Amino acid sequence: MAGCGEVSHSANMLPTNKKLDEPCSNNAPSLSVPECAICLQICVHPVSLPCKHIFCYLCVKGASWLGRRCALCRQEIPEDFLDKPTLLSPEDLKSASRGNGEYAWYYEGRNGWWQYDERTSRELEDAFTKGKKSTEMLIAGFLYVADLENMVQYRRNEHGRRRKIKRDIVDIPKKGVAGLRLECDAANLNLARESSADGADSMAALGDSSSQPAHVLPARLHTSLSTTTSQVLSHSDVTTSLENSFTQLQIGDPVINRNYIGEEGRPLIIARMQATNAVLEEQEPSDRNDHGSPALQHNSFLVPQSNRLPFGNP
């Protein structure tokens, strides 16, 4: 880089009254609005990156689509910078939303209308007043065509996606200017982001799901985890009663069933019951009440009257 007083290609850029051998002055007046190194024009809604380089907001937006890096130093741009940019003059955004004239130009958004930036609005208004059918606009590094007859815009090399445009008064409700939200919309946007970032939305979803009835676990898992001792005992009692029922119905080995018939052609169990009754009659009444009755009741329970085998030969 050539220093002061050295001949270089930038010598022609010096003022005519400035000599090459004069020392450089550091008190040169600085521009109130910086120039953008991307579009090479005066910055429109200038923003400052973390690396302190300044560009147009739309120029940074277009460059971030190609790669999230500064166009000068290649430092990485934060992911949320486009949502929360650092504006050099936020007051300019408010004045731009109020407009300089009676009418302004808008393009259609997802849930409302966006106002064009001041430079693009001047180009559209100039083409409209001159009666042109279309005009070209450079927005965020892409060349767009504004069809003033059908009031739509599209990229010059991509006609598939079209967006409506309109010329309307300045005071209509709008989302913002050139992708920059106004304060009311930005507050709602930040609130929505905070709700999704701190887990409030997910917690609310969990709260809604907790009000729904819980899924029933399988029967076997429920029994193994929450069965009490009394339930286990009742289960064993049921099993015992089933076995007794099978015994009463004489479901078992057929060889055992054949042994129920005695030698005299009477059922063997009945003969034993008669012998037991004879013994009980010889005992004292107290003994009969203490011992005989339970035995008799037990035998009667084992072989009901309805299940006795008929008399006959085996």
Swiss-Prot record:
A glycoprotein binds at Y107, R110, W114, Y144, Q153, R163, K175. Residues 296-308 have a biased composition (Polar residues). It is an enzyme of class 2 (transferase). It is found in: Cytoplasm, Cytosol; Nucleus. The keyword Iron-sulfur does not apply. It catalyses: S-ubiquitinyl-[E2 ubiquitin-conjugating enzyme]-L-cysteine + [acceptor protein]-L-lysine = [E2 ubiquitin-conjugating enzyme]-L-cysteine + N(6)-ubiquitinyl-[acceptor protein]-L-lysine. Residues 281-314 are annotated as: Disordered. CDD domains: RING-HC_RNF146. Keywords: Cytoplasm, Metal-binding, Nucleus, Transferase, Ubl conjugation pathway, Wnt signaling pathway, Zinc, Zinc-finger. InterPro entries: RING-HC_RNF146, RNF146, WWE-dom_subgr, WWE_dom, WWE_dom_sf, Znf_C3HC4_RING-type, Znf_RING, Znf_RING/FYVE/PHD. It comes from the Eukaryota. SMART domains: RING, WWE. GO terms for molecular function: poly-ADP-D-ribose binding; ubiquitin protein ligase activity; ubiquitin-protein transferase activity; zinc ion binding. Residues 91-167 form the WWE domain. GO terms for cellular component: cytoplasm; cytosol; nucleus. Pathway: Protein modification; protein ubiquitination. GO terms for biological process: positive regulation of canonical Wnt signaling pathway; protein autoubiquitination; protein K48-linked ubiquitination; ubiquitin-dependent protein catabolic process; Wnt signaling pathway. Its EC number is 2.3.2.27. The WWE domain mediates non-covalent poly(ADP-ribose)-binding. E3 ubiquitin-protein ligase that specifically binds poly-ADP-ribosylated proteins and mediates their ubiquitination and subsequent degradation. May regulate many important biological processes, such as cell survival and DNA damage response. Acts as an activator of the Wnt signaling pathway by mediating the ubiquitination of poly-ADP-ribosylated proteins. Neuroprotective protein. Protects against cell death induced by DNA damaging agents and rescues cells from G1 arrest. Promotes cell survival after gamma-irradiation. Facilitates DNA repair. This is E3 ubiquitin-protein ligase rnf146. It comes from Xenopus laevis (African clawed frog).
